[in-house]
Regions:
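Short, basic, low-complexity termini and linkers enriched in Ser/Thr/Gly/Pro
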Residues: 2-19, 84-117
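A conserved beta-strand-loop-helix scaffold within acyl/acetyltransferase catalytic domains
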Residues: 42-79, 83, 124-132, 255-259, ...
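Glycine-rich, histidine-containing beta strand-loop boundary motifs that form or position
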Residues: 122-126, 143, 173-178, 219-221
Length: 426
């Protein structure tokens, strides 16, 4: 937990509510017990939502550890909202259990929590790299979750904004978990299906709460659906043949040993050239990029991660991942020995994937490299032992017209819309 200036807890019992009565208290997270409450919030919010995929608790907790590289150039403060069990009616069985949370085997985990039920959470953060890049005192909020009571959301937003204002920020942007390289975006359309791997999901009432609290749209992003249960357009294969004839070679990403490290260095160089000017993006060092790549190494499937080379230099890639949310949903946020067995068993059911990025250097696009990569990436999914039925291409900013044109011309259709919000700090 990141320390913050001493402050009293905030109460929101006098705020107007369209939902319930009861006292809401905002607490700055500073203890291990409060961190546990912070981590429990999603399980309460999404208890009755069939589309929610529980994140690994360990992966969330790790982001607040004292050795997080983010702390070298940023700072943050976690907040939780707590209240009595009447405020979680309709979200979980907590109210029926008289405010006691239980483990999977029904044993009481924490007693006498009638006034300490976690109702929501938020993290306010200051990313100095973002401030330096944009030349403005822009703070961030992220990790936001809350039950369907507007008072809870309002109190959490107030706490985050007050903390950011005390840090000298004049504007807030989010949801962004420390940076856009991490989890970000709020789902505003497309609530009828689960999220793909490493994509956000939230209740449909979040956008309404944001707007009621005075937040406005900063930018939208889209997720495209691309069906694979039909023949691919002939243009894809033709583009692949043209690229090969022009001297471009293609291969799967190396995923082992020194070859993996070397490929990741090439990927970093391409990312830096192609995406460094993306809106709200912040620079990453090579070591930060390699650390993230190593954490994902065991998840990479070379069948859906083709790279393009010209005269020995990597000039493009298609970054695909199997939709690991399918087995992760069965793990329920716990990767213990039983969770690992469940993950490996249900991994065999994966029949779809997500395309995180398509990249080719501009000077090689006339060699049909982008379409050739699409062809190889899609065919890699189609030829799996359990053929992929579809792919999601996400996320693409609304004003990234070159990428949108390429995806839409290839048959992709927008099926989910996400949003980043902003608010001025008066």
């Amino acid at each position: 937990m990141n320390p913050s200036p001493p402050s009293d807890s905030l109460t929101a019992n006098d705020r107007p509510s369209s939902q319930t009565s009861g006292t809401i208290e905002i607490i700055s997270v500073t203890t291990a017990a409060e961190q546990e409450l912070f981590l429990e919030v999603p399980a309460i919010v999404y208890a009755n939502d069939p589309n929610w995929v529980p994140p690994l608790r360990s992966s969330i907790a790790k982001q607040f550890a004292s050795d997080n590289p983010f702390l070298q150039y940023g700072k943050f403060q976690q907040f939780i909202a707590v209240g009595d069990s009447s405020l979680v009616t309709g979200h979980s069985s907590l109210a029926a259990n008289n405010g006691q949370r239980t483990t999977d085997n029904g044993q009481s985990k924490i007693q006498n929590l009638k006034s300490q039920i976690p109702l929501g959470r938020i993290v306010a953060s200051v990313n100095q790299r973002l401030i330096d890049r944009e030349g403005a005192a822009i703070g961030l909020f992220g990790f936001f979750e809350c039950v369907s009571d507007f008072r809870v959301a309002e109190a959490l937003f107030d706490a985050a904004c007050q903390w950011l204002k005390a840090q000298g920020m004049t504007k807030v942007r989010g949801p962004i978990d420390f940076s856009t390289h991490n989890n970000c975006l709020l789902l505003v359309d497309g609530f009828d299906s689960p999220p793909m791997v490493m994509m956000p999901y939230n209740p449909s009432y979040y956008p309404e709460f944001m707007e009621r609290d005075g937040w406005h749209k900063a930018k939208d992003a889209y997720a495209y659906n691309f069906p694979l249960d039909r023949p691919l357009p002939e243009e894809f294969e033709k583009a692949y043949r043209v690229a090969v004839k022009s001297g471009v070679t293609f291969r799967p990403l190396n995923i082992k040993g020194e070859a993996f490290e070397q490929d990741c260095i090439s990927l970093y160089n391409l990312f830096t050239k192609a995406f460094s000017n993306n809106w709200s993006s912040t620079p990453r060092t090579l070591e930060e990029f390699l650390e993230e790549a190593r954490s994902l190494q065991s998840l990479v499937d070379p069948d859906v991660f083709p790279v393009a080379e010209y005269e020995g230099e990597m000039i493009g890639f298609w970054m695909g991942l199997p939709d690991y949310n399918i087995p992760l949903k069965r793990v329920n946020g716990k990767l213990n020995w039983l969770g690992i067995l469940k993950f490996l068993w249900y991994k065999r059911q994966i029949d779809q994937g997500r395309v995180i990025a398509i990249c080719s250097l501009p000077e090689y696009r006339r060699k049909m490299v982008p379409l050739a990569l699409i062809y190889l990436g899609m065919m890699g999914g189609i030829k799996k032992g359990k053929p992929y039925k579809r792919a999601e291409l996400s996320w693409v900013y609304e004003d990234n017209f070159p990428s949108r044109k390429l995806i839409e011309a290839s048959g992709g259709k927008i099926y989910k819309t996400y949003r980043i919000y902003e608010k001025e700090l008066g």
